[in-house]
Amino acid sequence: MLLSYIAFVLISYGTLPLVEFLGDGDEQRGFALTYAFYGAITFAVFLLTFKGVRERYVEGDSASNPLESLAHIGRARPFWIMFATSILIFTLMLMPDSAAIYFFKYYLGEASSVSLFLAMGYASMVAGVIFNQLVMRRFCKRRVMIGANLAYGVALASFFVAADQGPPFYLAAFMAAKFINGIIAPTMWAMVGDIADYVEYQSGRRATGTTISAVTFSHKFGMSIGGLVTGVLFSIYGYTPNTEQSETVLVLIKSMMSVLPAVGALGVAALMLIYPLGDRRMAEIRTAKPTAA
């Protein structure tokens, strides 16, 4: 996960310059060639990964087919809480990443600065991922998610005010939010592993792959909803590309960088209050599940 966020830093800072270089003034061609370049690198890395991975399978009573696995997962209440959590995260909480270009282009009038802004945010997120290791050793994952999402909401809400106070203030608010997001992301993935263990404990059958796939689906579903929400809001409030925006649209853009994702963070914190798998409960489950060492 740490390396993936380092890649985010490089992509955030390098994409627009690469578009300009490859497109030679043609933005559409530049983006097409840039993402083709990224795709080629991704394909090569996947090949290297598959070549180097050796599966270590722990013998256990697995479900005989995916539908049976899905049936077991569907009866697990923690899964549905995590499913809703993931949708909130990928619909609202990651909205600042997609709204940043609009914020810099129309609200600040400094479109060229967005690459550095995002790169610094993701660099802060890398620091948060590293710090997460210290936090997870001392605190229950559920409590970390509650506290981190409350802090994330406060940091994002502060951006609404900081946006009008100058670069040091809005950059500090964004970097603080991204640092906290670096704590949230790996904690969420650790909880997905807990759900897989819970499903095995509850059903007596392993369904780890299907559990992870189902949660990953919620991520993609949330991303698609997030894109839809952004488009619908822009349409409702009268956004017109490449023109001077109305005051209403400018407030919407600033809210997409701050208030709306903050609401998502508070929603996640609320869901975590009813999430039943704390670290103490998971210790009991791992001792009792069929493949316990």
Q: Where are these predicted regions, by residue range?
A:
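Intracellular juxtamembrane helix-capping segments at the cytosolic ends
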Residues: 184-203
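Glycine-rich segments within core transmembrane alpha-helices of 12-TM secondary carriers
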Residues: 1-17, 122, 214-234
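Loop-to-transmembrane helix entry/capping segments in MFS-fold secondary transporters
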Residues: 1, 111-112, 199-218
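Intracellular loop-helix junctions on the cytosolic face of multi-pass helical membrane proteins
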Residues: 1-101, 105-110, 261-293
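Helix-loop junctions at membrane interfaces in 12-TM secondary transporters
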Residues: 160-174, 184, 190
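Helix-to-loop junctions at the C-terminal end of transmembrane segments
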Residues: 19, 127-141
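Loop-to-transmembrane helix entry
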Residues: 29-36, 100, 106-124, 169, ...
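Structural signature of the two symmetry-related core transmembrane helices
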Residues: 143-158
